[in-house]
């Protein structure tokens, strides 16, 4: 019987869940050209590794390119030379794109929302410039479940970030290939790979409600170790006849 090291077990577990998500949600098709959003955090670094390796080994055949968006007026900084070297290690071309936004233009929305939206627009621009038909983002299962809880709590909506989303306005498909990967495994991978941390973190990070939802997800898993799978399953098990039905 083959004995695997702890590192090998972690990598095999991540790749198994990654490949399952890609296949289960039909995220990659023959001839795709996929732009990877590379922020510089552990999740996007892992995504470069996983997609770069899959592009060389598995069918259907597809190609990838990674972009790091620099928001010039936000003191959030990554070592771009490190990011470029990381991409080269997995055969992924690297692009850097600079942009900026003014948080004062819309005080009704948080700086995080405005920054995220402007980064997203930059991704669409670069994707079109490089002939890409899909954009891959590094959201994992925890991100998706936390967003589900946030939307229920703050928006009164049963919605989240889906593994695959067609953005008709931009004629572009957003994919999240790590949708079934657990954040704990990515933390372990980052330690095993010695991923370099960002030079400076975003000053608005602490204003996010996401850390609160991380705590709630941990509490749910303390009550029920299978809670994350129950939450995930609930998104495709909506029993409408057992929900309130308004009479117009």
List each model region and its residues.
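Short, structured secondary-structure boundary patches
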Residues: 54, 110-122, 155-160, 212-229
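Conserved active-site and cofactor/substrate-binding residues in soluble primary-metabolism enzymes
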Residues: 13, 118, 181, 208, ...
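ATP-dependent adenylation/nucleotidyltransferase module used to activate substrates
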Residues: 2-146, 154, 184-192, 242
